[in-house]
Amino acid sequence: MSSHQKLYEGKAKILYTTDDPEILLTYFKDDATAFNAQKKGTITGKGKINCTISSHIFKLLETNEIPTHFIDCPASDKMRVRRVKILPIEVIVRNIAAGSLCRQTLLTEGTILKFPLVEYCYKNDTLQDPLLTRDRLLILELATPEQLEQIRTFAVKINDILINFFNQCQITLVDFKIEFGLDKHENLILADEISPDSCRLWDQYQTDPNQRVMDKDRFRRDLGKVETGYQQVLERILAHQG
């Protein structure tokens, strides 16, 4: 395939080939979706913000011995990544009750969980990304027992690192979604992105349930000032690291 041929387009990113078959170019879009793409819109500047935030977080995780697909960013909205085979599993780590966890249980939003809750969803839009047990994952052969154990270990470690990091930015990490892939050597690698699109982030300077939201919930719940929330996350990360 020729250089920069479109390989795949998702809701928030486009993947392109490069001259190196083992390296892909990810373009971060300003498009926003929610509720399995039932709600669509545009968040101005989101692509550049998410790309920059993800690059900083991937670098942080790499220094803490979490392997990622990140290589570098040739532009503010583009990221070069190692080619991996994505596992069709969305891994969710929750520290505070919010979103679907509240809808599916009697927990109220804001309840601090006794321990980090690690959940798995089948990445399948047709099925609306159903919650899966470990045994269902194994029966569907979405991952091996060894891979699931490693995924959980990585997820818990990533959570510890990010809680500490965001706390230093005066941001509370409520929950987040991550994805993993396998490289050509079958090594498990963190892929996709970590940004306000995939994390719930609350401003520690705010107490109002709506004002504190700094993530895509501002878009989901029509809270307004979506761009401002994303930009504030980026500014605090840059200020902390600068």
UniProtKB/Swiss-Prot annotation:
EC code(s) of this entry: 6.3.2.6
Entries under NCBIfam families matching the protein: purC
GO BP, sorted A to Z: 'de novo' IMP biosynthetic process; cobalamin biosynthetic process
Protein family (similarity comment): Belongs to the SAICAR synthetase family.
SUPFAM superfamilies with a match to the protein in the record: SAICAR synthase-like (SSF56104)
PANTHER family in the cross-refs: MULTIFUNCTIONAL PROTEIN ADE2 (PTHR43599), SI:DKEY-6E2.2 (PTHR43599:SF3)
Protein's UniProt name: Phosphoribosylaminoimidazole-succinocarboxamide synthase
Membrane-spanning parts: none
Listed pathway(s): Purine metabolism; IMP biosynthesis via de novo pathway; 5-amino-1-(5-phospho-D-ribosyl)imidazole-4-carboxamide from 5-amino-1-(5-phospho-D-ribosyl)imidazole-4-carboxylate: step 1/2
Entry GO MF terms: ATP binding; phosphoribosylaminoimidazolesuccinocarboxamide synthase activity
Keywords: ATP-binding, Ligase, Nucleotide-binding, Purine biosynthesis
Primary enzyme class: ligase
Pfam families: SAICAR_synt (PF01259)
Gene source species: Trichodesmium erythraeum (strain IMS101)
Catalytic activity: 5-amino-1-(5-phospho-D-ribosyl)imidazole-4-carboxylate + L-aspartate + ATP = (2S)-2-[5-amino-1-(5-phospho-beta-D-ribosyl)imidazole-4-carboxamido]succinate + ADP + phosphate + 2 H(+)
